[in-house]
Amino acid sequence: MDTVTVLNELRAQFLRVCPEKDQMKRIIKPYIPVDEFNTEQCLDSSIRELYMNSDGVSLLPELESPPVSKDFMENYASLGKMRIMRENEGQKGKANQNLIGAEKTERDEEETRNLQDKSAKNTLIVEENGTLRYNPLNSSASNSLLNDDDHTSGKHHKTSSKEDSYLNSSMEMQKKSSKRSSLPFVRIFKSRRDHSNTSGNKNVMNTTNTRAKSSTLHPPGARHNKKGSKFDMNFDFDENLEEEDDDDDDDEEGDDIHSQFFQLDDDFDAKGSGASPAHKGINGMSNNKNNTYTNNRNSISILDDRESSNGNIGSASRLKSHFPTSQKGKIFLTDNKNDGQKSDSLNANKGIHGDGSSASGNGSVSRDGLTETESNNISDMESYINEKDLDDLNFDTVTSNINKTVSDLGGHESTNDGTAVMNRDSKDSRSNSNEFNAQNRDRITPGSSYGKSLLGSEYSEERYSNNDSSTMESGEMSLDSDMQTNTIPSHSIPMSMQKYGIYHGDDDSTLNNVFDKAVLTMNSSRHPKERRDTVISGKEPTSLTSSNRKFSVSSNLTSTRSPLLRGHGRTSSTASSEHMKAPKVSDSVLHRARKSTLTLKQDHSQPSVPSSVHKSSKEGNILIEKTTDYLVSKPKASQLSNMFNKKKKRTNTNSVDVLEYFSFVCGDKVPNYESMGLEIYIQASKKYKRNSFTTKVRKSSTIFEVIGFALFLYSTEKKPDNFEEDGLTVEDISNPNNFSLKIVDEDGEPFEDNFGKLDRKSTIQSISDSEVVLCKVDDAEKSQNEIETPLPFETGGGLMDASTLDANSSHDTTDGTINQLSFYKPIIGNEDDIDKTNGSKIIDVTVYLYPNVNPKFNYTTISVLVTSHINDILVKYCKMKNMDPNEYALKVLGKNYILDLNDTVLRLDGINKVELISKKDARELHLEKMKPDLKKPVLPTIQSNDLTPLTLEPLNSYLKADAGGAVAAIPENTKVTSKAKKISTKYKLGLAKQHSSSSVASGSVSTAGGLANGNGFFKNKNSSKSSLHGTLQFHNINRSQSTMEHTPDTPNGVGDNFQDLFTGAYHKYKVWRRQQMSFINKHERTLAIDGDYIYIVPPEGRIHWHDNVKTKSLHISQVVLVKKSKRVPEHFKIFVRREGQDDIKRYYFEAVSGQECTEIVTRLQNLLSAYRMNHK
C-alpha cells in the first residue's frame, strides 16, 4: 500500500468520525491531476471510493479547502525567500537611509522602482485558484532577462560605475535575504548579541556604496504587504509581528547568524535565483534564448564559485564539508540535463578573463562575500547539526545525480580536455592567489571553528603559512566535496578526518573504542570506486592549501583514509597535470608535521602508525594492534608449604610464647558475674613470694588453666626486672605441669602436705578463698600431672592432634557418671575430651565434593570453631582450593537440602559432614534451603546445655555411648508422610501412641542418617537428676533434620516423649515479671520447672543486697491458665489459685525471645495436661 492511499484513508476516516462539521470542512482535498476542472472525476477510482460514506455519498463536495498542489512544497522555499527578501530589503534600506544623503536617495529612487517591477515580473511562483503553482513562462522570461543583462554587460564594459555598483548592491541584498530562505520559521534560530550594534555599524560602513543603492528597494510600508493564501503552510505565522519589537541592527545581525549556523553559501543561493554578478561581468558571449544555460550555470556553480574572488584557491562553497546537501542543491543538480558544450565554453570564457571578479578592488571584503567583522563573528555552533531535523531529507539519489551532472559537464569533450581547460585557469590565478594570501593571512582563521572552538585543536602555524608548498589548485576540486552521500554523522561526529580530532582525557579508553568504531562504520559504508568517478581531476587532494580558507572544502575528501589518522592525516596528490608539478613539501617536512600532529595519540598509549600507512592512504589500509600485555597473576603459595613454614617458625620462637595459649583465661573481657579476682603468690620467686599480683580469671576455667595463665602473666606483664636471678628458669615455667596451686595459709605460706592442694581438673569457682600460691612439684608428681592434664601443645609450639589427646586418657573416665544415651548427638566429644582440649572448642568438618562418588578419598577436613558459621567452612575450603565462594553452596550429606550459610555450626547437630555443590547444580536439582530451627532454644537453660553461641561452656553432660547401644540402623530414605498441622495436646505429649524400638527401626520417625553405627556421642538430657535409670527409648532423632514443618506453636517440646514430665526433669528460664504499678515495671526473675512444681526465684548472684525478693513455689495443680500473648510474642501469663483461698493470683512475664516464650508455655501446658489426666 503506497503512501498516498494511507494518507487518504486517514483523511477519510477523520471525515467519518469528526463531530464538528466546520473542522471537517478544513481537511485538504486529495491531489487532483487536472487543476482547471477541480472535480472528483479526475481522481483515481480507488481513492475516490475511500471518501464514500456508508450510504454511498461522496464526502468530497463538503470540503471547502483547495486540493493539494503537486508542486507546492517544491517551490515553497522560493516563495518564502521572495516574501522575506521584500520585507527585509525595505527594512534594511530604512536603516541605511540615516547614513546616506537625501540627494543620493532621490537620485536612485526611480532606478530602484524599475528594478522592483522587473523582479515582480520574474516571479516563479504564482497563485491561481487558491493554489501556488510554478509558472514556466515567467521562468523563461526571467532567464532571458538575466541573459540579456549578461549580454549587455559583455558588450559595454565601460558602463558607468554607478550602474555596476547598483547591480552589485542588489545582489548583495539578495545574498543577505536568501539566508532566511532555508527555514520558514525564522525566529527559531534567532540570536541576540550584545555587540550587534557595533558589528552592524561596521558592516554598514564597509558596504556604504553597496547599501546606498539598495536602500529604497522597498518603502517602509512594504513589510506589511504580505499576501498569503487561505491555507498557508506558515499556519498564519507572521514574521512582521515578531520583528517589529527588535532593533534593525539586531535583525541584520540575526540574518548573518542564520546563514552561519547552516553554513549556506551566499553565491549558491543567489545563483539559484538566476542572478550572479560574477557571471554578468565575465561571460560576454552568453545565449539569452536557452533556458538550459542558466541551469548549467547553476549546476557548475560549485566550480565557478572558486574563481569569484581574486583567483584565490577555492571559495567553493560555504557548505561545510561534513554538512549534508540541501534540497535546493539537489534540484539544481537534477535540473541539469543537456548542453554540456556551453559548460565547457563557460569555463573557457572564464579562463580568458583570468581572475575575473567584480569585487577585486575592494580590500575590506573577504573572498566569500563576508566582511572582516562578519568573518570573525562566525557562530561556534556552525559545525553542529541535529540529526533528527534532517531525517525527512532523502539523500539516496544524490550519487546518481552527481554522476549524471559530471557526465553532462563533460559534454562531447573528454574529461582530460576539461581538466586542461581548468588547469589554464589555475595557472592564471596562481600568481594572484599568493598575493591575496599575503594580504589576508592575518585575518583568515586556519582550520574549522569546530576544531578551534569546541575541541581546542592544537594546529601548527607552519602548516598554514607555507603557501609555496601548495600541491592542489582550484582546478582539481571535486564535486563530492559539497555534494556527498551518507554524510549525516552519528551524534555530530565529524566525517572529515583531516582537521578534526578527538582529544583525550586521562581515561578515555571507552570513548576511543566508541569513536573508532563509529568512524570505521561510516568509512566502510562508502564505495571508493563511486567516489573516484565524481572527482573531476585529482583523486586525493591534500589539505595543505585548502586549509587557508575559513570554510574547508576538501575536508571531506580525506574521509576514506584510515581512522588512525583521525584529525591530522595528510596525503599526496596523484594528479597528472603540468601545473601539479609545482614545488611540493619534502618528505622530511611531512614527517615532522605528522609527528607533531600525532603526539597526542602516542601519549595515551595508542598504537603508533607507521609511515607506510600515511603514504598508502588510497588503499584505505587500517592498522589494528591487539593488546596482549595483561597483568599476570602471581602464583599463590601452597597450603602445604605454609604449614611447614609455620611449623618451622613456631619451633624457632621462644618456648615461653606457647603460654599465650592460656590467655583466654583472662576475665577482663567478660561480665563481672562471670569472673573473679585472684591474688597469686609464687613460692619459688623472690619477688612474688611475699608480694602477690592481682588478676581476674573466668569462673569456668579449671585449676590447670589458671596455673598456665599465672605463668603467662609471670613471663609477660608481671615479669620481674632480674628474671634470670628471680629463681625460675624458662624451662620451668614453659610447662604448667611443673606447678600446682594451693590455698594460702594465714601466715602467707602454703599449707603443708596435700592439705589445701586444689584439684587440677576442678573449676576455679569451687574455691572460697581468693589467695592462692604456685608451688613447684617433684618429678613423681609431675609425671602424675602429665597423665592427668596433658599439655594441649607440644613444647616446640605446635598444637597436638585431638586423637593424641584422646589416646592418652580415653581408657578411663574420672567423673564416674553413668553411660547414658539420649536423643541428641553433641557437636564435640565427651567431657574428658573437653577437659583435655582445655576449652579450645575446635571441631573438624569433612567436606566432600559433589557428586560424592568416592567418599574414602574425595574429601577435605576443615577445622572451625564451634561459634563460627557455616559460611566460614565454605570460605576456608574455597580459599584453600582457590575457588570463588560465591559460586558454591553446602548441602547436607545424602539429603536434598542446602544449608543456610548464616546458621552456626551447631546446625550440623554433630554430623560434621557436608557436600560442596555449585549453585548451578543446586538449581538444576531443585534443592531446598533448610528452614530455620525454631525447636531448639538458643539461650542458656538447663535443657539446652549444649554449646550454643551464648552457652560456650559445656557442663558434665556428654558421655560415651555403650558399645552395644540401643540405636538401631535406620534407612535414610524413610520420611514422615504426615505434615505438621495443628497438633493436639495428646499427640504433643505422645499419649496417643507409645513409640518403641521396633517402631523406630521400621521408620516411624526420621533420623539424621549419621547414627546408624551407634558409636556417636549423645547428650545427657537429665543432667540435674539421677531419676532416669535403664535404657531410654529412642525418640525423634535429630529433630532439626526432620521433614516436619515447625511453627511457633510447635516448639521444642512438640513431638518429644513425655517421660521427662514424670521423671523430675528440671528446666530453668530467664524471665522478667511485669508489674504495672511498680516504680520499675520489669523485674528480672528465674522461672524454674522441677517436676510438678514451678518456682519463681530471684536471679542468681545478680540481686542487690537490700532487695527482699521472695521465692514463690507453685504446684501444677494450682495453675488455672497458661497463655501466650497474641500481640507481643515474648509476653505470657500464668493464673494461679492460692491454697485455701478462692482468689486468683495473676503473673505476667516477658521471656527473652518469642521462641523461648513458646517453649515455656508449651511445657507448662503439657505438664498441666498430663497431671490432669493422671488425677481424674
UniProtKB/Swiss-Prot annotation:
It comes from the Eukaryota. It holds the Pfam family SIN1_PH. The modification Phosphothreonine is found at T510. Residues 1065-1169 form the SIN1-type PH domain. It is a peripheral membrane protein. One of its GO terms (molecular function) is molecular adaptor activity. The keyword Phosphoprotein applies. GO terms for biological process: establishment or maintenance of actin cytoskeleton polarity; regulation of cell growth; TOR signaling; TORC2 signaling. One of its GO terms (cellular component) is cytoplasm. The keyword Membrane applies. The target of rapamycin complex 2 (TORC2) is composed of at least AVO1, AVO2, BIT61, LST8, TOR2 and TSC11. TORC2 forms a homodimer. Contrary to TORC1, TORC2 does not bind to and is not sensitive to FKBP-rapamycin. AVO1 is required for TORC2 integrity by tethering AVO2 and TSC11 to the complex. Component of TORC2, which regulates cell cycle-dependent polarization of the actin-cytoskeleton and cell wall integrity. TORC2 controls polarity of the actin cytoskeleton, which is required for orienting the secretory pathway toward discrete growth sites, via the RHO1/PKC1/MAPK cell integrity pathway. This is Target of rapamycin complex 2 subunit AVO1. It comes from Saccharomyces cerevisiae (strain ATCC 204508 / S288c) (Baker's yeast).
